[in-house]
Amino acid sequence: ETDRFLLLHRGRRWNDSQRKWMGWERKRGKLHELNRWLRGVADTTFMAVGGHAPVVPQGVRYVITLDTDTQLPRDSARLLAGTMAHPLNRPRFDPRCERVVEGYAVLQPRITPFLPTGPGSTAYQRIVSGPGGVDPYGAADSDVYQDLFEEGSFAGKGIYDVNAFHAALKDKVPENSLLSHDLFEGVFARAGLLTDVDLFEEFPSNYEVGARRQHRWVRGDWQLLPWIVGWA
């Protein structure tokens, strides 16, 4: 019998490119190793916590991935899993193309900023952030990519099918070559947009934090250029 809750911690490795000790391949490596671990592969950087190695849970079909500032509202996990399990959304992986060609291995819900109120909010958040909170009259949003091409853009916070996601991304990316992995993963694993399910996240508290985040995103997008033009 496995535990209901697991604490997984990865050991740090020295990265010559970054000149620092860090988790292998950051968040992309974390998900890659998690998928391998869930399928029984022992060769990962996950460490024993408290002297006991975590027991691998059996039969895990989906993984919901969130950032530290992301909030999962009540019943959202049930809605995400139910939508993934719908027969029309089930992913079909093509071994020849090495990607998902039908259905979706990833579903991206709508990301809504927290309401910038309370003692922790700032004037910058109230001025710059978009409309926050729950819209009681809102319905599913329209999205150009989803409406025209039946695919959405993965933003790194959502649910994915472990088997299809791992098969589509296996051996695709060399080390130290990709910072913004979300869009890349959404292309090969085929992401769908689920706009009638909300996740909430905190907007940057000041301009400096927001600028650093935007700079990181732009750097990551430029690193996708070799795959766009066919160099990779």
PLM regions: where:
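Internal catalytic domains of large membrane-associated glycosyltransferases
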Residues: 1-232
